[in-house]
């Protein structure tokens, strides 16, 4: 046993003196490898030169020594890892009070969705629209009830809407239409002309859809507002042609259905491939949205139109991007392309 104690003591001393991982692994192989010294001692137990009692006693002692060696090895390995980490932290130390530094190559461009948002707001601002904002976590009233969306409407299904865990009374807003409701409640009296951009959330994710995306919705409420080319059609047609910088761009309004507008329409533009492409939805504000239980605007006196567009989709069209997910990957090589 004295020989065993001597070997393990030498091994532990060698482990503690190791200066790097390479030396440490060599020491482990010398003592615990297939031909290591402690491994060799275990093999002597089966040479037939010991009685069963001696083999049991000496074997237990050798295993105890192996465990001591392994404990010392683990401690040294952890110490070397810690020393390596501290050295790296010291080398990469950053004073967070220092001013920020520009990205390599002077990259200062805004995100393409932000650039698209700014362009949309700029165009509508030029037509007299005010920017409005609201919370992203909405209650059932503002997100559904006030917009004439009944309790059994498919949009309320959990597979389409993210519910907040508070008894299913709040949701991550599924559109920016609640901003319009809040604005009308605060404004009280028309005329109202707003554009409401922001993040919205729906349970969807693929090359052309994201669970979080960006919308911009417009609202115009005043006496005598109509769907005709003097009002809704005129505003959106002018906007879409100026956005894509094409005075000859063909625009069509295709009958559709939305709970909060009547009549309603999908808006299409003619693509470069000669096919119609959907870019938004619109319609005349449903009289139920104006009623006393909602925003208390007299539907006999006032009319209004609303429209909505997907900013991410507009960015894809503007910059010829075919996969929506590229906007959320934070790849600088991709983002540097946009000015």
Curated annotation (Swiss-Prot):
Keywords: Aminoacyl-tRNA synthetase, ATP-binding, Cytoplasm, Ligase, Magnesium, Metal-binding, Nucleotide-binding, Protein biosynthesis. GO terms for biological process: phenylalanyl-tRNA aminoacylation. Its cofactor is Mg(2+). InterPro entries: aa-tRNA-synth_II, aa-tRNA-synth_II/BPL/LPL, Phe-tRNA-synth_IIc_asu, Phe-tRNA_ligase_II_N, Phe_tRNA_ligase_alpha1_bac, Phenylalanyl-tRNA_Synthase, tRNA-bd_arm. GO terms for molecular function: ATP binding; magnesium ion binding; phenylalanine-tRNA ligase activity; tRNA binding. Pfam families: Phe_tRNA-synt_N, tRNA-synt_2d. Binds 2 magnesium ions per tetramer. Its EC number is 6.1.1.20. One of its GO terms (cellular component) is cytoplasm. Tetramer of two alpha and two beta subunits. This is Phenylalanine--tRNA ligase alpha subunit. It comes from Neisseria gonorrhoeae (strain ATCC 700825 / FA 1090). The gene is pheS.
């Amino acid at each position: 046993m004295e020989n065993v104690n001597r070997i393990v003591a030498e091994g532990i001393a060698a482990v503690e003196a190791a200066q790097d991982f390479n030396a440490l692994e060599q020491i482990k192989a010398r003592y615990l490898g297939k031909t290591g010294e402690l491994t060799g001692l275990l093999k002597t137990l089966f040479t037939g030169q010991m009685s069963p009692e001696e083999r049991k006693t000496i074997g237990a002692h050798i295993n105890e020594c192996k465990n001591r060696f392994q404990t010392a090895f683990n401690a040294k390995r952890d110490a070397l890892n810690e020393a390596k980490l501290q050295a790296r932290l010291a080398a990469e130390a950053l004073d967070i009070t220092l001013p920020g530094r520009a990205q390599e190559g002077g990259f200062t461009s805004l995100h393409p969705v932000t650039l698209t948002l700014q362009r949309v707001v700029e165009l509508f601002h030029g037509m007299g629209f005010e920017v409005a904002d609201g919370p992203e976590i909405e209650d059932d009233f503002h997100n559904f009830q006030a917009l004439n969306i009944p309790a059994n409407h498919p949009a309320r299904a959990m597979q389409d809407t993210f519910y907040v865990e508070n008894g299913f009374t709040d949701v991550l807003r599924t559109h920016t239409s609640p901003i319009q409701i809040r604005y009308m409640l605060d404004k009280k009296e028309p005329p109202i002309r707003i554009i409401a951009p922001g993040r919205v959330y729906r349970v969807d994710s693929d090359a052309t859809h994201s669970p979080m995306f960006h919308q911009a919705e417009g609202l115009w409420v005043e006496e005598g507002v109509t769907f005709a080319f003097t009002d809704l059609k005129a505003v959106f047609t002018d906007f879409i042609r100026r956005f894509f910088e094409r005075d000859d761009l063909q625009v069509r309004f295709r009958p559709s259905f939305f709970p909060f507008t009547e009549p309603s329409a999908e808006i299409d533009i003619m693509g470069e491939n000669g096919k119609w492409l959907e870019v938004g939805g619109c319609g005349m504000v449903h009289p139920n949205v104006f009623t006393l239980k909602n925003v208390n605007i007299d539907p006999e006196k006032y009319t209004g139109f609303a429209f909505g567009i997907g900013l991410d989709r507009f960015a894809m069209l503007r910059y010829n991007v075919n996969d929506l997910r590229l906007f959320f990957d934070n790849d600088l090589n991709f983002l540097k392309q946009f000015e």
